[in-house]
Amino acid sequence: MAKPGTRTRKKVKKTVVDGVAHIHASFNNTIVTITDRQGNALSWATSGGSGFRGSRKSTPFAAQVAAERAGNAAAEYGLKNLDVLVKGPGPGRESAIRALNACGYKITNITDVTPIPHNGCRPPKKRRV
């Protein structure tokens, strides 16, 4: 039982003006994370967590919904400007950026940070359908 004299402090939301949107677009899913400049996560959303399952997870519309959810959750911190870092070859790259722009953020920079191997791991075998 809590002591009657102790009070817990109310958690103060920090205000962040500039943020970074990390979009990881794989062939199966899209993950959108919005952080501050130091890399501390403010909000995140995924296509799978937005209610899409199976092959619908990897559609541009699912990436758009995930970006809208992450953008609306990050709006509580007072974000105005976003740098966008896009990683991966997935189908949700473009639509996630457009959805963040539609949320009212000023996108200052778009950077592709897809890791490119210098002939590293062997790629998966080609599909035969």
Swiss-Prot record:
One of its GO terms (molecular function) is rRNA binding. The keyword Disulfide bond does not apply. Keywords: Ribonucleoprotein, Ribosomal protein, RNA-binding, rRNA-binding. InterPro entries: Ribosomal_uS11, Ribosomal_uS11_bac-type, Ribosomal_uS11_CS, Ribosomal_uS11_sf. GO terms for biological process: translation. The keyword Transport does not apply. GO terms for cellular component: ribonucleoprotein complex; ribosome. It comes from the Bacteria. Part of the 30S ribosomal subunit. Interacts with proteins S7 and S18. Binds to IF-3. Located on the platform of the 30S subunit, it bridges several disparate RNA helices of the 16S rRNA. Forms part of the Shine-Dalgarno cleft in the 70S ribosome. Belongs to the universal ribosomal protein uS11 family. This is Small ribosomal subunit protein uS11. The lineage of its organism: Bacteria, Pseudomonadati, Pseudomonadota, Gammaproteobacteria, Oceanospirillales.
